[in-house]
Regions:
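N-terminal type II signal-anchor transmembrane helix
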Residues: 2-42, 46
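Cleft-lining beta-strand/loop regions that shape enzyme active-site pockets
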Residues: 40, 47-168, 177, 295-422
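Charged, glycine-interspersed solvent-exposed loop segments at helix/strand-loop junctions
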Residues: 168, 172-270, 420-500, 504-506, ...
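C-terminal long alpha-helix characteristic of the crotonase
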Residues: 227-228, 259-301, 413, 469-475, ...
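Intrinsic disorder and flexible/low-complexity segments
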Residues: 299-302, 306-342, 460, 531-587
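Active-site proximal loops enriched in glycine and acidic residues that flank catalytic Cys/His/Asp
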Residues: 306-309, 351-353, 381-383, 403-405, ...
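Short glycine/threonine-rich loop-to-helix capping motif typified by GTGT followed
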Residues: 358-363, 496-499, 541-543
Length: 587
């Protein structure tokens, strides 16, 4: 028996030693993964910056090495900031011979694609090459790749050039079938975010608005491609009418959309010849961006504060939440810290948002007013800065937007669901109430809103709209009547907004930074991005579970993911919304 216990004890001790060793080695490996991003990669002579036009493009991406290691990172995300930095560095780095663009399935708004394209156009002034290849080109990726010196497509490849369409989904009859009715309150002829819940088609006003801005975006895209590919705009429109995605690859050569057909091995051989190297040395945007030294500056910093996603008053969590969010209270605190940071001489707000909570938007507007009393505040609009996104922008000293930016949408709406048809008529649930005051049970889902409540709700929405108009009028030196005439929830492109004086200049983030520095009267400045990245511990555990679950929920729900996400987000936010009237992803 004594021998038996000795053997058991030996096994237990052995297991503890092995577990401790495994635990220690695991932490060493995690430490190595987390610290790997802090070291600069070695770049060899004749290297090529490879930019994959694939995945989801975000303003900033903080890579989670644990998620990637466990295979839970879902759809690949790329940071626009890294792409722009790497292109700028590649132009002056002697070890970079040129840029290689490889096309895939690329999800990005047109304004962000336009900014990448402009950066590549500037890069060409260095005299270095840009080569593009694709097994296939979707329209957004082709728009960027068309700037290349040489454009190749696989002999069996596909190029999709079809124009722009907006195809909103309407849920009214679906909700009626399950017994839910959305009670809507809004201000603005064009504030059509509620239309999917109360109609089965677009209103005439909404249709006219959407037609206006997609025409403007398409005009810019065609002019850019026309200049690069030496194809007339009329010819590009004719090609867009002819189902180019279904034609033979040789037709792309004949119509000058591409230069030639080639297999990937032939393109690699071309790159080896151009770089005069036997083995291709490719570097990614993230690797080259590690060489960015723009944070160094003798006379202080220009802070670039990134705000992307739905505007919310409190964090909305869950596997069908809206992803990246602009959390109002956090932004207010962050801007207060930047206000009191003496090393920060000016702030650029980089905004990519279709809006959200009207209350949170108002609080962030106030934070911007306090900030600009101490230092210049310049807004750089990315793909969207509409509704609540414009609300937080309008009080800045100066606003810069891309020609294809979607902005404006100055309007307010509110929605209250009436689920009595579902709960009572279909499920047999009945409700009774005992209350002390008339408004005690306002908003209960077991009944609809009565006439008095509806009138109060409409007044509430109208007060929110009137406040929005005053904020824009004060910020843009206009009267409220002038603002109202171009507001009403209408969405404008950056080009249109410039003519309406809703913005000050068409340009890039780089232009906004230069304007902020000019206003702060600093020449030698550093550029620092905010909010600061999460610490390693937070980064280690953040999003691993949610990424894993979200990826699978998206797969199960398919096209129904977006509408469910929208309703879920509204449920967890404020009743009053300053939000874009539609999903801006144009196809």
């Amino acid at each position: 028996m004594k021998t038996f216990f000795k053997q058991v004890l030996a096994v237990v001790v052995g297991m503890l030693i092995v577990s401790a060793f495994t635990f220690l080695m695991g932490f060493i490996m995690l430490g190595a993964m987390l610290s790997a991003g802090d070291s600069k990669p070695v770049i060899k002579n004749g290297s090529v910056l490879r930019i994959d036009l694939s995945g989801n493009l975000q303003e900033r991406v903080q890579e989670n090495p644990v998620s990637a290691f466990l295979g839970m990172s879902g759809t690949e995300e790329q940071g626009l900031d890294n792409i722009l930095k790497s292109i700028k560095i590649a132009a002056t780095n002697d070890k970079i011979s040129g840029i290689y663009l490889e096309s895939g399935i690329f999800s990005a708004d047109m304004a962000s694609l336009e900014e990448i394209r402009k950066a590549l156009t500037d890069f060409k002034k260095s005299g270095k090459f840009i080569i593009a290849y694709g097994d296939s080109y979707l329209q957004g990726a082709y728009y960027v790749a068309s700037v290349a010196d040489s454009l190749y497509i696989n002999p069996s490849g596909m190029l999709d050039w079809h124009g722009i369409a907006s195809q909103p989904m309407f849920y009214k009859e679906l909700l009626e079938k399950v017994g839910v009715k959305m009670q809507v309150f809004r201000v603005g002829t064009f504030k059509s975010a509620v239309e999917p819940f109360i109609r089965t088609d677009m209103s005439d006003a909404n249709r006219a608005m959407v037609q206006s801005f997609i025409n403007d975006i398409w005009t810019v895209a065609c002019k850019d491609v026309s200049a690069s590919r030496k194809i007339s705009v009329d010819s590009l429109n004719a090609l867009a009418d002819n189902y180019m995605a279904l034609t033979d690859a040789n037709d792309y050569v004949r119509t000058r959309l591409v230069d030639r057909t080639a297999y990937i091995d032939e393109v690699r051989e071309t790159l080896r010849r151009l770089t005069k190297t036997e083995h291709l040395n490719m570097v990614s945007p993230a690797e080259l961006a590690a060489y960015d030294e723009s944070a160094n500056g003798a006379n202080g910093q220009i802070a670039v504060y990134y705000a992307q996603g739905d505007i919310v008053g409190s964090e909305v969590e869950g596997v069908i939440s809206s992803g990246q969010q602009i959390l109002g209270p956090k932004v207010v605190d962050d801007l207060d810290r930047l206000c009191n940071d003496e090393n920060v001489k000016a702030v650029v707000l980089r905004i990519n948002s279709g809006g959200g909570s009207a209350y949170a938007s108002e609080q962030m507007w106030r934070a911007v007013q306090l900030l600009k009393k101490k230092k210049p505040v310049v807004v750089s609009m990315s793909g969207m800065a509409a509704s609540g996104g414009y609300y937080m922008s309008c009080g800045a000293d100066y606003i810069v937007a891309e020609p294809m930016t979607l902005t404006g949408s100055i309007g307010i709406f509110g929605m209250v669901p009436d689920a009595s048809g579902l709960l009572t008529e279909k499920l047999g649930l009945h409700f009774d109430v005992v209350k002390t005051n008339e408004a005690s049970d306002f908003g209960a889902m077991g009944r609809g809103i009565n006439a008095g409540e509806a009138a109060a709700m409409q007044r509430y929405v109208e007060r929110g709209y009137a406040l929005f108009l005053r904020r824009v009028a004060d910020g843009r030196n206009m009267t409220t009547a002038q603002v109202d005439s171009i507001a009403q929830g209408r969405v404008w492109t950056g080009r249109q907004a410039l003519n309406l004086k809703l913005i000050d200049k068409l340009g890039t983030l780089e232009d906004a930074i230069r304007e902020a520095a000019r206003r702060a009267k600093v020449a030698d400045y550093g550029i620092v991005a905010y909010p600061a990245p999460a610490d390693w511990y937070t980064q280690l555990f953040s999003d691993v579970k949610d990424d894993y679950m979200e990826n699978r929920v998206k797969g199960m729900l398919g096209v129904y993911y977006k509408p469910l996400q929208f309703v879920y987000t509204l449920q967890g936010t404020d009743c009053l919304q300053a939000r874009m009237p539609f999903d801006p992803n144009l196809r």
